[in-house]
């Protein structure tokens, strides 16, 4: 009985260590909010964010409740927009995504890619809504 108890305790400790190790991994995409503020357009707000893409990373297909205006500051990404061909966007280049358009961006390079994004969106709505089953 004592042996089973020690085995169970060891299994729990192992599981907790494994979870801690996995949660310590760097995410493939990270969005850090830089600023969020009301603007003069009624019911709208501006949000600025830093997007960091590890190699192979991206947010997955999603939409925004307003326009996205982004500038690549490091590396390059491949931009995928519904109804348009994929486009490589590199450091020093920018792009605009219209409101509600399904899109994704992926870092297909070997180094980190970073963008600064400004969103002019409907206040009180989620900044990004994932799209599944595409």
Pin down the residues of each PLM region.
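Sec/Tat-exported extracytoplasmic proteins
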Residues: 51, 57, 73-76, 81, ...
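Histidine-centered metal-chelating micro-motifs
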Residues: 58-60, 78, 95-106
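Short acidic-glycine-tyrosine-enriched beta hairpin
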Residues: 53-54, 83-100
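Ligand-binding loop in jelly-roll beta-barrel domains
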Residues: 86, 100-126
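Short histidine-centered beta-strand/loop micro-motifs
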Residues: 59-64, 81, 88, 106-108
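Glycine- and acidic-residue-biased ligand/ion/polar-headgroup-sensing regions
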Residues: 65-83, 93
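A short beta-loop-beta micro-motif enriched in histidine and acidic residues
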Residues: 40-44, 56-71
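A short, N-terminal "cap"/entry segment at the start of jelly-roll beta-barrel domains
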Residues: 2-50, 88, 96, 126-134
């Amino acid at each position: 009985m004592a042996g089973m108890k020690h085995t169970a305790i060891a299994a729990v400790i192992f599981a907790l260590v494994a979870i801690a190790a996995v949660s310590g991994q760097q995410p493939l995409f990270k969005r850090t909010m830089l600023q969020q503020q009301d603007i003069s357009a009624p019911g709208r707000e501006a949000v600025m964010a830093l997007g960091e893409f590890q190699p192979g990373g991206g947010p997955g297909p999603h939409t925004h409740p307003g326009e996205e205006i982004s500038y690549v500051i490091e590396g390059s990404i491949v931009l995928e927009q519904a109804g348009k061909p994929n486009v490589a966007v590199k450091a020093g280049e920018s792009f605009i995504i219209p409101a509600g358009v399904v899109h994704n961006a992926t870092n297909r390079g070997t180094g980190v890619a970073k963008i600064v994004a400004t969103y002019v969106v409907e206040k009180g709505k989620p900044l990004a809504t994932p799209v599944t089953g595409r």
